Amino acid sequence: MLDLIDLKILRTLQAQGRARLADIAEQVALSAPAVMERVKKLEVNGVIKGYTALVDGKTVGKDVTAFIGVSIGNQRDLDRFAAQMLNYADVLECHHVTGDESFILKVKARNTGALEKLLGEIRSVEGVTRTITKVVLSTAKESQVLELDDNLTEGHARRK
């Protein structure tokens, strides 16, 4: 279960992924080894899923962001489709959703030509009956930071 110190550690790591353990320890009034032990526990328990650098796509030649709604005609093709999306580097996210589409994909492509090629490949996946694409013109907010409510502490355990 998470306690208030765990939440403080998580907030710090979300804001500053490269924060030094000694700095975090000072913020939460623990020793660096105690903070390291807590971070390891958060990793082992799957609370912290990993560490990554957030790269601006435009600076590395990924100029087009799009969301693609994908309809799958048959229930038995859902898992196969999701598994195949793991093979596409330009597909950043693949979510099984409710509504008219079966999946929503977030993609970043080099240009519209690369997006068109990717769409063709996605449409050729067995079971795909339709795609709807929304190209992003501008982004007002894009974040990976989760708000962590203090009610997640003991006595208010999260449900899986």
Where on the chain are the PLM-derived regions?
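A compositional/biophysical signature of low hydrophobicity enriched in polar/charged and small residues
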Residues: 1-160
